[in-house]
Each structure stands twice: as structure tokens, then as C-alpha cells.
């Protein structure tokens, strides 16, 4: 395409305008932080989506363990006060472009200024990722990037789906936004005390229902994501079939069978540039 020609220039602008916009929300991402396979996917998939013609970006927490060489390259985009239940918390957004991919980092020292990525699986962990989920949605109009698809991953970002449908549905800015939830490991679900419903999520008693967020008397973040996501994917077709059964379903096989028409299994690939034996 020769951009110097008027017609082709118009075509280029149209193609850019019509690009599918995807925001990949993850609790970890290479090359910044990694504890498991989610970081590999979050690091590789947005790059491939961009090569396929999409405008794919990533949002993750601004953890303290992120190396200084990356932190120094970030630019401050915005900051605001985030309402999380009765709490008012600072929320900053930092931005870094690396290898053609735009990364947004949600900054809050209280939640992410620790020496570790994940902590004990207690209420403080639930509060951290309830904050992260709410911050993702609140930051979208402020970063001037409203995606077509929010790609959520595991329980840490699954609650974005219920929050979007229950608290932002009436806002025209969010009306077109759709969610895809990828389940990497069904065993980890983000199960916390019922108090999260009112104190942090402000979702109210009607959502504490066995068909929605309630799970054995508690709030289940991943279950909420499964119920409210527009589409659900897993890391392989085999795993997608397995989690529909009681043996592999980790107590969520019933809700997954109810969403079976929205569920698909996609085999994970690898970033052959990053995992290249010739460079080892």
C-alpha cells in the first residue's frame, strides 16, 4: 500500500479505524512478572493479535517486583480516586510501549507495593484483585482506549465481567464492550467471604444467588466471570470437555454446562521468538 496516494491514505485510515481493539487483562505477563503459564500467554498472544491486524494491548498490576529498567521507561498517563465499596483508593495508570505492544500498569502501593506477586489466599488477596478489576473498568475512558473486547484471565480478572454487566451497562461508553474469559486452571477460583459483595464490590444481595456469584455460602470470583462473560475459553478442546464433568469441574461443572454454548477450547501456543533454543 502506497500511503502517498490519496485513495490509499484514506484506505489506511479506514483500516486503522476498523481494527478490532482488544485489551488483555492479566495478573502477570512476560517479560515483567511470571509465576506460571498465564504470563507466557499474556506476553505472546497480544503480539500475535497485532500481527493479525488487531490493536491489542495489555493491562496488569504495577507490582514492586517489576524490574527497574521497565519502571523507568513508563510514562504516567493519569491518576484518580477509585471507589471500592466504602473505601476511596488512589489509582494511577502507567504506560509502556515495548516491541510494538502497549502495556498499562495499574499503580497502587498499598495493593501492589509488596515484594511478591501473589500472597496468602485470604481476604486481602480478594481485595487486591477486586480493586484491580474495578480499576480496569474505571481507567478505560481515562486512557483513551475503549476496547471492543476485554480478554479476562482466571479468577484475578474474572470479576470484571459481573462488574461490567451490573454496574456499567447503563453507561453508553461501555455499551459495545464484550468480554472473553479464559480459564487456565479451574482449581483456582477466588473464593471469599460474602462480605465482599457489599463491602468491596457493591453488588448487593440479589447477586448472592446460587445461579450467579454464590458458592457454598461464599462469593466465587471465577464463577461470577463464567456466568457473566460473553464468551469463555480454555487452554485446549480436551480441557473444555473435561471441566464439564463433575470429576474435573471443581464444583463448577454445573454452571459451565449451563454456559456450554459459549465455551470453546483453544490450544495454547508459544512465542517462538522468546522461546528460541538458538538464543539460549
Predicted segments, located by residue:
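Short, Lys/Arg-enriched N-terminal segments with co-localized hydrophobic residues
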Residues: 1-10
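Catalytic cores of nucleotide-sugar-dependent glycosyltransferases that transfer UDP/GDP/TDP-activated
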Residues: 11-280
Amino acid at each position: 500500500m502506497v500511503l502517498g496516494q490519496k485513495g490509499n491514505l484514506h484506505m489506511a485510515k479506514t483500516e486503522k479505524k476498523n481494527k478490532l481493539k482488544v485489551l488483555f487483562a492479566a495478573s502477570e505477563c512476560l517479560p515483567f512478572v511470571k509465576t506460571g503459564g498465564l504470563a507466557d500467554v499474556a506476553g505472546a498472544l497480544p503480539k500475535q493479535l497485532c500481527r493479525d491486524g488487531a490493536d491489542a494491548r495489555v493491562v496488569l498490576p504495577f507490582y514492586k517486583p517489576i524490574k527497574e529498567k521497565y519502571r523507568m521507561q513508563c510514562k504516567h498517563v493519569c491518576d484518580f480516586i477509585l471507589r471500592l465499596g466504602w473505601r476511596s483508593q488512589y489509582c494511577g495508570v502507567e504506560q509502556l510501549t515495548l516491541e510494538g505492544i502497549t502495556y498499562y500498569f495499574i499503580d497502587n502501593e498499598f495493593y501492589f507495593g509488596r515484594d511478591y506477586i501473589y500472597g496468602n489466599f485470604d481476604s486481602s488477596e480478594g481485595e487486591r484483585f477486586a480493586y484491580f478489576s474495578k480499576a480496569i473498568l474505571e481507567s478505560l475512558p481515562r486512557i483513551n482506549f475503549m476496547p471492543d473486547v476485554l480478554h479476562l484471565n482466571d479468577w484475578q480478572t474474572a470479576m470484571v465481567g459481573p462488574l461490567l454487566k451490573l454496574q456499567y451497562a447503563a453507561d453508553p461508553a461501555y455499551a459495545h464492550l464484550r468480554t472473553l474469559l479464559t480459564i487456565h486452571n479451574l482449581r483456582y477460583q477466588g473464593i471469599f467471604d460474602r462480605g465482599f459483595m457489599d463491602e468491596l464490590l457493591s453488588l448487593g444481595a440479589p447477586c448472592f444467588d446460587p445461579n450467579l456469584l454464590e458458592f457454598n455460602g461464599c462469593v466465587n470470583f471465577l464463577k461470577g466471570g463464567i456466568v457473566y462473560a460473553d464468551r469463555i475459553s480454555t487452554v485446549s478442546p480436551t480441557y473444555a470437555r473435561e471441566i464439564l464433568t463433575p470429576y474435573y469441574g471443581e464444583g463448577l461443572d454445573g454452571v459451565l454446562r449451563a454456559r456450554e454454548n459459549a465455551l470453546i477450547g483453544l490450544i495454547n501456543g508459544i512465542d517462538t521468538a522468546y522461546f528460541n533454543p538458538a538464543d539460549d
